[in-house]
């Protein structure tokens, strides 16, 4: 089977790249409120130690903590609400019987879409505009697009041959609509997508009251939609690289208003907020 590793989430060749200047002897530490997460490396790989406010300490291999496998799938859905999704270059089918999109690459996408009635309805409407029909081939377990040629003939277009924008929209909407009480992590959901369809994803994010989202983006369309419709629930963090370190700065309420006023030019003026 496919190797389950941290490389599915972070673009690195070896684990040492996670650490500042490659120094694996110094743990990575992330603190929030009264909790702390530490990342270390041993002979078996990357380990994460979680320290809670009630002094409980748990150490788990990275694969158990963040990756859904057939061995830990039951625990994953109840214990760990954090789910990172990365649109894959190639979809690999997984016949795991769960009702949410499997992180990180949505290997059960086809099955999940068939369970989401609202998503199926929306896809039907989108393809109807082009005289096409959304269908699900139960034999191959794949989403397909059908064109009726007349005289009882049809032409089937496989999922992987439809527009990249539509594939990505289906992937992210399936992730949003199939999850509840979860923290969803998306990396540039706008990539390779036509702006009107980006808005369909951001609208789902805004309307999803049961999930929290962490999103990296370089899209003024994504930022503008969120600022316009969800500012009270929004925190924007800007990143910079100074003196060999990654710096993260949270925008203030007044800066959020300035960002909205910049509109499409926001990403040409980020230095204004990083001073």
Residue ranges of predicted features:
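Walker B catalytic acidic pair
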Residues: 187-189
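Walker B motif beta-strand of ABC-family P-loop ATPases
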Residues: 183-185
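Phosphate-coordinating catalytic segments in nucleotide- and nucleic-acid-processing enzymes
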Residues: 2-181, 248-275
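C-terminal lobe/lid and adjacent interdomain/linker elements of RecA-like ASCE P-loop ATPase modules
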Residues: 199-275
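Conserved D-loop-proximal element of ABC-family nucleotide-binding domains
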Residues: 191-195
């Amino acid at each position: 089977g496919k190797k389950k590793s941290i490389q599915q989430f972070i673009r690195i060749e070896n684990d040492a790249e996670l650490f500042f200047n490659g120094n694996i002897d110094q743990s990575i530490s992330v603190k929030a409120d009264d909790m702390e997460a530490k990342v270390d490396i041993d002979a078996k790989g990357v380990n994460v130690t979680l320290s809670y406010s009630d002094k409980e300490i748990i150490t788990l291999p990275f694969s158990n903590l963040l990756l859904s496998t057939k061995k830990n799938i039951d625990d994953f859905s109840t214990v760990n609400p954090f789910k990172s999704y990365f649109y894959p270059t190639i979809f690999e089918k997984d016949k795991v019987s769960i009702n949410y999109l499997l992180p990180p690459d949505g290997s059960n996408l086809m099955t999940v879409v068939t369970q989401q009635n609202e998503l199926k309805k929306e896809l039907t409407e989108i393809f109807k505009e082009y005289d096409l029909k959304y269908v699900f081939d139960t034999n191959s377990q794949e989403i397909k697009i059908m064109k009726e040629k007349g005289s009882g003939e049809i032409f089937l277009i496989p999922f992987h041959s439809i527009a990249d924008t539509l594939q990505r929209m289906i992937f992210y909407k399936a992730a949003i609509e199939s999850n509840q009480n979860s923290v969803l992590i998306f990396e540039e959901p706008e990539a390779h997508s036509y702006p009107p369809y980006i808005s369909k994803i951001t609208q789902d994010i805004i309307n999803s009251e049961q999930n929290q989202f962490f999103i990296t983006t370089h899209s003024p369309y994504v930022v503008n939609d969120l600022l316009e419709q969800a500012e009270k629930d929004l925190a924007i963090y800007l990143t910079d690289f100074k003196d060999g370190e990654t710096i993260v700065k949270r925008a203030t309420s007044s800066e959020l208003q300035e960002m909205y006023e910049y509109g499409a030019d926001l990403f040409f003026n980020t230095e204004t907020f990083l001073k």
